[in-house]
Amino acid sequence: NSYFEQASGFYGHPHQATGMSMGTAGHHDQSATAAAAAYRGFPLSLGMTPYTNHHLQRSTQDSPYDASITAACNKIYGDGNAYKQDCLNIKSDTINGYKDIWNTTANGGGAGGGGGTGGGGGGSAGSANGANNTANGQNTSGGGGAGGGGGMPVRPSACTPDSRVGGYLDTSGGSPVSHRGGSAGVVGGAGTGVGQSGQSANVGGAGGVGGATAWNANCTISGAAAAQTASSLHQASNHTFYPWMAIA
C-alpha cells in the first residue's frame, strides 16, 4: 500500500484520525476522508502534533550494534590500563613489542634502528650499539648499518627536497619538476650520467630522468589529433551548465 492509498490503513485506519466512525452508510465521502487522514496522520511530523497515533508508534529496541560498540569501548577504555600500552610504553619493548627506535637515548637497547631488523651484524651487542641509536638519521645504525639491510640508502627526511639529497635522481637541474622536455636532456641521455658528488656514473640509465622521456616532458600534438583533443577538452559553447549538473 502506498502512502496515498489510505483505504486499507497503512498508517492506521483512515477514520480514527478524523474521528469519524464507519457507521452503516458504508461508502460516504471516501476521498475527502482519506485526504484528511493522509495529512493528519503523517508520520514525519515536526514535533508532537495532537494527531499522532501514540498507540501505533513502535517502541525502540536495542540494536545488536549498540552492544558490540559498548563491548569494544569497554575493552579499549574500560579496564584502565589496556589502552595505555601503545601510548605510554613506547620507550621499552617489554609490553607489546613496540619500541621508539628514533627517540631513545643511548641505553643500549637492542639493535640500533635498522641494524637488527635488516640483518646488520652485532645487533645484540646492546652497549656497543647504544651510541648509534641516536645517529639513525645517517647511514650508521647498529653494527651492520642500514645499508647492509638490503642496500637501500636512508632518505634523510621526508621534507628534504630532491635537489638537496643527491644520489637518488640526477638532480643537476634541481628538483625533478624542473626537468622540462629538453633542458637537461644531455644529462641522462646516453646512460653515461654526470656522477655528481661522487655517485656512480650509470645513474642516467637508458634515457634518464632528464631526457626526452621525462615524466612531465612538454608534448606537442599537431594536426587533426590536436584539433580533436582541443575540441574535446572544452564544452560546447551552446551548452548551458546548470549548477545541479555538478551535484547530479
Swiss-Prot record:
Molecular function via GO: DNA binding
Subcellular location: Nucleus
Motif (Antp-type hexapeptide): 241-246
Top-level taxon of the source organism: Eukaryota
Nucleus in keyword set: yes
Low complexity bias spans: 126-139
Bias (Gly residues) ranges: 116-125, 140-152, 182-191
PROSITE patterns: ANTENNAPEDIA
UniProt keyword annotations, A-Z: Activator, Developmental protein, DNA-binding, Homeobox, Nucleus, Repressor, Transcription, Transcription regulation
Biological function: Sequence-specific transcription factor which is part of a developmental regulatory system that provides cells with specific positional identities on the anterior-posterior axis. Binds the consensus region 5'-TTAAT[GT][GA]-3'.
Name of protein: Homeotic protein ultrabithorax
The organism of origin for this protein: Musca domestica
